Amino acid sequence: MDIDPYKEFGASVELLSFLPSDFFPSVRDLLDTASALYREALESPEHCSPHHTAIRQAILCWVELMTLASWVGQNLQDQASRDLVVNYVNTNMGLKIRQLLWFHISCLTFEREVVLEYLVSFGVWIRTPPAYRPPNAPILSTLPETTVIRRRGRSPRRRTPSPRRRRSQSPRRRRSQSREPQC
């Protein structure tokens, strides 16, 4: 069975394969990032989004994989065989987990459409012969200048005060935003 874990998100294994393996941070760094940004939502018993669910599943798979690796390390006597297993896990399984975690964390951080646009842009860039492409690869955190990011459900703020109000001479204080689960 050929299952593509990105299909329901509008991406594909092939699309992510354009990114070189050293592009993806270590699993430890990705887990730290997921925990720092989305711990509350990931630990919540409530469903937040398919991306949160996918991150949970990837974390569970990684934990199981590490349990297996520990067992192999303790029970396989032949050092050469042990090294082969560890190398396979790090090269193949580790990369798949890193790709999954990176994709879903990025979708939560930058929004899915931006990540998909980035993957397509990078794919076009990497397949263009070096003589014909810009020297620098596209960067995910660089959004086009025309992009406007607004929270859902909120109307845009007025840019000018109403004519009846007088402007205060003192600077305005910003309201502190309360930290809520980012679902």
UniProtKB/Swiss-Prot annotation:
Sequence repeat placement: 155-161, 162-169, 170-177
Motif Bipartite nuclear localization signal: chain residues: 158-175
Post-translational modification: Phosphorylated by host SRPK1, SRPK2, and maybe protein kinase C or GAPDH. Phosphorylation is critical for pregenomic RNA packaging. Protein kinase C phosphorylation is stimulated by HBx protein and may play a role in transport of the viral genome to the nucleus at the late step during the viral replication cycle.
Gene Ontology terms, MF aspect: DNA binding; RNA binding; structural molecule activity
Residues recorded as bearing Phosphoserine in the entry: S155, S162, S170
Main location per the UniProt record: virion
Bias (Basic residues): 149-176
Cellular component GO terms held in the UniProt record: host cell; host cell cytoplasm; T=4 icosahedral viral capsid
Region (RNA binding): 177-183
Region annotation (3 X 8 AA repeats of S-P-R-R-R-[PR]-S-Q) ranges: 155-177
Gene3D superfamilies per the UniProt record, alphabetical: Viral capsid, core domain supefamily, Hepatitis B virus (1.10.4090.10)
Keywords: Capsid protein, Cytoplasmic inwards viral transport, DNA-binding, Host cytoplasm, Host-virus interaction, Microtubular inwards viral transport, Phosphoprotein, Repeat, RNA-binding, T=4 icosahedral capsid protein, Viral penetration into host nucleus, Virion, Virus entry into host cell
One GO BP annotation of this record: symbiont entry into host cell
Top-rank lineage group of the source organism: Viruses
Pfam family, one: Hepatitis_core
Location relative to the cell: Virion; Host cytoplasm
Subunit (UniProt): Homodimerizes, then multimerizes. Interacts with cytosol exposed regions of viral L glycoprotein present in the reticulum-to-Golgi compartment. Interacts with human FLNB. Phosphorylated form interacts with host importin alpha; this interaction depends on the exposure of the NLS, which itself depends upon genome maturation and/or phosphorylation of the capsid protein. Interacts with host NUP153.
Function in brief: Self assembles to form an icosahedral capsid. Most capsids appear to be large particles with an icosahedral symmetry of T=4 and consist of 240 copies of capsid protein, though a fraction forms smaller T=3 particles consisting of 180 capsid proteins. Entering capsids are transported along microtubules to the nucleus. Phosphorylation of the capsid is thought to induce exposure of nuclear localization signal in the C-terminal portion of the capsid protein that allows binding to the nuclear pore complex via the importin (karyopherin-) alpha and beta.
Similarity comment: Belongs to the orthohepadnavirus core antigen family.
Protein name in the entry: Capsid protein
Gene it is expressed from: C
